[in-house]
Design a protein with these regions (language model features):
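N-terminal metal-binding scaffold of metallo-dependent hydrolase/deaminase domains
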Residues: 1-38, 360
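Divalent metal-dependent hydrolysis catalytic cores, especially in the metallo-beta-lactamase
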Residues: 60-62, 76-105, 118-132, 157-171, ...
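His/Asp/Glu-enriched, well-ordered alpha-helical/loop segment
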Residues: 230-238, 259-345
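Conserved, mostly hydrophobic/aromatic
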Residues: 125, 180, 210, 304, ...
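Active-site gating loops and adjacent loop-to-helix segments of metal-dependent hydrolytic enzymes
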Residues: 57-60, 80-91, 131-158, 200-213, ...
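Residue-level marker for buried hydrophobic side chains located in beta-strands
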Residues: 3, 53-55, 123, 188, ...
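Active-site core of metal-dependent hydrolases
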Residues: 150, 155-273
């Protein structure tokens, strides 16, 4: 058994404990939490805050490493770097590609998950079944959903396929949405100009997320709310959002998080090798199109707190909400029975002081 004592615990579900607080870890799980005097032998973390490890459900790359193209060893090393930085679970994300390219990419990512099963929850396929708001996705690669191809992919890779972003207009009749959701794959709506009613219809067919709210979708208009309006108001849909201050104005980030306590913050981080260039926390194609961010999950949390969101709530958007959105219900919480993926933070700056994965310290 390992015990940790800190000033307070941010539970991941929006709560903050009394002070002092402690937790006990056994066999990779949190077995007890409490306040007041800590168990004998507890490691004293002083005035630190303990919180769940951060969860990123949309990360395309890190540094110079593109998760769709790099080698297994390169991807593992990049994910390890992000884990040491406080992100203890993630979904490596693949953007639109020719259908015959997916087997090679997924074979590599299956090997990555085999090497890091405690960290890699699965894979997020962002495309190629996208619609009228392609963003950085090459339009020539976009296509109507191929239900048989998706079924074959899920048969081959099983629960490696954790999340699929598609556009309702690329899934007429919602066959792909229904088929994926029936298999336990989370379906997100994105890169779409679908109208409000169409977005609701897709949610009724099984979609439960809206990928990077306000980006890759039609605008929010007071008479035509579109996908943004559905993501903000139709409760079966949970919005994710990139809080770098570039993809979405900070005022609208705050609006979205206030409107949807269950919203998820993501990095949408990409590799910053040519032709992608990084500037002010965002990544751009040569023509100026936004291609993602260069955030870490801890950066994302700190930026949300800078908007006036309380730390416990910012942590919820980056932990419990993210894990719940993809069915990883034993993560993202500091509570008995949850996985012992925990971070320690400075109480004033939220700088990282320590990381534990499966109860093992990485520092």
């Amino acid at each position: 058994m390992t015990a940790l004592r800190a000033a307070r615990i941010l539970t991941g579900e929006g709560g903050t404990s009394a002070s002092p607080a402690w937790l006990v870890i056994g066999d990779g799980r949190i077995v007890a939490t409490g306040t007041g005097p800590a168990p004998a032998g507890a490691t004293d973390l002083g005035d630190a805050l303990l919180a769940p490890g951060l969860v990123d459900i949309q990360v395309n790359g890190s540094g110079a490493v593109d998760f769709a193209r790099a080698s297994v060893d390169e991807i593992v090393a990049a994910i390890d770097d992000r884990t040491i930085g406080g992100c203890t679970a993630c979904l490596p994300t693949i953007c639109s590609a020719p259908l015959d390219a997916y087997a090679g990419m997924l074979d590599r990512l299956a090997a990555v998950r085999a090497a890091r099963p405690e960290t890699v929850l699965g894979v997020h396929l962002e495309g190629p079944f996208l619609g009228g708001a392609p963003g950085a996705h090459p339009p020539e690669l976009l296509r109507t959903a191929d239900v048989e191809w998706l079924q074959a992919l899920c048969d081959r890779y099983g629960d490696l396929i954790r999340l699929v972003t598609l556009a309702p207009e690329a899934d007429p009749g919602h066959a792909a949405t229904r088929g994926l959701s029936e298999r336990g794959v989370t379906v997100a709506l994105g890169h779409s100009t679908v109208d409000y009613d169409g977005a609701r219809a897709s949610a009724d067919a099984g979609a439960t997320l809206a990928t990077h709210l306000f980006n890759g979708m039609g605008p929010l208009h007071h008479r035509a709310p579109g996908l943004p309006g559905a993501a903000l108001t139709y409760r079966p849909l949970v919005p994710s959002i990139i809080p770098d201050g570039v993809h979405v104005h900070p005022a609208l980030v705050r609006l979205a998080l206030d409107a949807r306590p269950d919203a998820v913050i993501v990095t949408d981080a990409v590799a910053t090798a040519a032709p992608v260039a990084a500037r002010d926390g965002a990544a751009y194609l040569p023509d100026g199109t936004l291609a993602g961010s260069t955030l870490t999950m801890l950066d994302a949390v700190q930026r949300v707190v800078a908007l006036g969101v309380p730390p416990a709530i910012a942590i919820r958007h980056a932990t419990h909400n993210a894990a719940s959105a993809v069915g990883a219900n034993d993560r993202g919480r500091v509570a008995p029975g949850a996985r012992a993926d925990v971070i320690a933070l400075d109480p004033d700056t939220l700088a990282l002081r320590g990381v534990w994965v499966d109860g093992e310290s990485l520092s």
